[in-house]
Regions:
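Non-catalytic signal-transmission and effector/linker regions of two-component phosphorelay proteins
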Residues: 1-13, 117-136
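Acidic catalytic/metal-coordinating carboxylates
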Residues: 42-46, 69-73
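Active-site beta3 strand of CheY-like receiver
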Residues: 54-60
């Protein structure tokens, strides 16, 4: 009987940022499947405006975007809310991780292509541990 309660606890309000609308739509569809509320932005400027207006449990951003890259967006978000979890989705994950320069403001990196399971893992890793401890 505890399963629905854990699922309800873990529902998040998530901001997804990607300059490719189809990627935003795909991520939104996957996250909606798990009961999360998702809003999308197609660039960093739009994302920052939305972030200022609303409280999000998590921000998921692409790395390679015009004007402001995902790590720059993450740093700008952390400057406003230091504890805000930020996950980055990128085709450049291995290159970025092996560069030796940690990405400021990024809590977790997902490699493209990705599956719903990768999103679930990222959400679990960056979320406060209260709901995970009950499972263990």
């Amino acid at each position: 009987m505890g399963m629905p309660k854990v699922a309800a606890l873990s529902r998040k309000r998530i901001l997804v940022v990607d300059d490719e609308p189809f990627v935003c739509d795909a991520v939104k569809m996957m996250l909606n499947f798990d009961g999360h509320t998702v809003e999308t932005a197609h660039n960093a400027k739009e994302a920052l405006a939305m972030f200022e207006e609303g409280k999000f449990d998590l921000v998921i951003t692409d790395f390679a975007m015009p004007a402001m890259k995902g790590d720059e967006l993450a740093a700008a978000i952390k400057a406003r809310a230091p504890n805000q979890p930020v996950v980055m989705i990128t085709a450049y994950a291995e290159m970025l991780q092996s560069s030796g320069n940690p990405l400021k403001g990024v809590d977790f990196i997902i490699s493209k292509p990705f599956l719903l399971e990768n999103l679930r893992e990222a959400i679990a890793k960056v979320s406060p541990s209260e709901s995970r401890e009950k499972d263990e």
